[in-house]
Amino acid sequence: MKGATLTRADLCEAVHEEVGLTRQDCAGLVERTLDLVAEALEQGETVKLSGFGVFQVRAKRARMGRNPKTGEPAEIEPRRVIGFRASQVMKARIDRALGG
């Protein structure tokens, strides 16, 4: 990884170097994996990757908020959001890597 952000291209390159598949095959593998995760979330399923974490779609209720420009009350519609909770293994790994 070159910068502070891991990209799809970085993932593809890492898979290519580790597994030895062609770059094109690695790109397809990474894309298919991400598609499977997205499809599961679209269906409202929870995606659990052991040792990594859990992606989950949650429903948020409608609520009253404020228009930041006018300060007037405004209703915020109900919506769905994606949450991620890192596993204990991942949290410990990050703590070790970042000196925490």
From Swiss-Prot:
PROSITE patterns noted in UniProt: HISTONE_LIKE
Gene Ontology molecular-function annotations: DNA binding; structural constituent of chromatin
GO CC terms of this entry: cytosol
Stretches of the chain forming a coiled coil according to its record: none
GO biological process terms on file: DNA recombination; positive regulation of metabolic process; regulation of DNA-templated transcription; regulation of translation
Pfam families referenced in this protein's UniProt entry, alphabetically: Bac_DNA_binding
Keyword Transcription regulation in annotation: yes
Keywords: DNA recombination, DNA-binding, Transcription, Transcription regulation, Translation regulation
Highest rank taxon of the organism: Bacteria
Keyword Nucleus: no
SUPFAM superfamilies: IHF-like DNA-binding proteins (SSF47729)
Family membership: Belongs to the bacterial histone-like protein family.
Listed PANTHER family: DNA-BINDING PROTEIN HU, INTEGRATION HOST FACTOR SUBUNIT ALPHA
Subunit structure: Heterodimer of an alpha and a beta chain.
Classification via HAMAP family: IHF_alpha
Function, as annotated: This protein is one of the two subunits of integration host factor, a specific DNA-binding protein that functions in genetic recombination as well as in transcriptional and translational control.
Protein name as catalogued: Integration host factor subunit alpha
Organism of derivation: Caulobacter vibrioides (strain NA1000 / CB15N) (Caulobacter crescentus)
